[in-house]
């Protein structure tokens, strides 16, 4: 049995506080990869697992794994 070496992937995730409590987490580079959690820590844990499963499914289907090319730039808008 051949063991495939693990690879590290780095992605930006965004977390939003929900109005009714908890957090919504998503990875913009991985379309449709979303999760949630009652706490910030739980949301981070859940989105990490969701990303792992997402990448594993891409690899299993011999699809390319997207590379992070997201640029995050905070803006100040004077209105």
Curated annotation (Swiss-Prot):
Pfam family, one: HicB_lk_antitox
Top-rank lineage group of the source organism: Bacteria
Listed GO biological process terms: regulation of DNA-templated transcription
Similarity-based family: Belongs to the UPF0150 family.
Name of the protein: UPF0150 protein ssr1765
Organism: Synechocystis sp. (strain ATCC 27184 / PCC 6803 / Kazusa)
């Amino acid at each position: 049995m051949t063991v495939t070496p693990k690879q590290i992937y780095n992605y930006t995730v965004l977390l939003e506080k929900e109005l009714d409590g908890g957090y919504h987490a998503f990875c913009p580079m991985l379309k449709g990869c979303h999760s949630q959690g009652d706490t910030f820590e739980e949301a981070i844990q859940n989105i990490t697992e969701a990303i792992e499963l997402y990448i594993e499914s891409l690899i299993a289907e011999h699809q390319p794994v997207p590379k992070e090319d997201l640029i995050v730039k905070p803006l100040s808008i004077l209105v």
